[in-house]
Amino acid sequence: MANAWKLEQFIEMLLGVTGVALGLSFMMKSGLGQTALTAFLQCISLISGMKSGTLLMCFYLLCVLLQLLIQRKDFDKLQVLQLPVCWIQGIIINLTCYDIAFLADIRPVSYPMQWVFLAVGMILVSFGVTLTMAADLVKQPFEQLIVVISKKYKKPFNFLRCGADAVFITCSLLLVAEIGRAHV
């Protein structure tokens, strides 16, 4: 019975991760709003030519490696499940935004449709996060890194998370300004 429960949790986590990735894709396509992290990664994508999903995979992998370095022997083996999270989310974003033509070509054609895309994205991300949290196996790699840093250095999670978002937003704005200067 315990194995069936673990399988159910794993499936719930996979559905949640998929929901988050699809939601991020919709939000990115909306052109109106997204997370601080995905905004930063999209700026890097514009500069480097790398796909946003690939950059997300690399960033999440870095987060898992940093967790391992910080926690060392205290690293919970279950957290290795963050690696498929990295891969699944990156692949889904790449498939829906770049690789599968009929999905990549779906874009909002009007301002009201941009809002619809944003709303659908937010709903999918919320649903995905809810499923992932309910599965209670692993968190998103970036969130887990902030948790690890918070515990290690005895700093409030919300302070560190808001600080990280502020850094990503600041970097995004600087990159957008630089991209704008390069195209003038």
Role assignments for model-derived ranges:
Residues A39-G49, Q144-K154:
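Short amphipathic alpha-helical coupling elements at transmembrane boundaries
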Residues K77-I88, S110-W115:
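Cytoplasmic-side transmembrane-helix entry/capping segments in multi-pass membrane proteins
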Residues A182-V184:
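Conserved small/polar residues in nucleotide/adenosyl-binding loops
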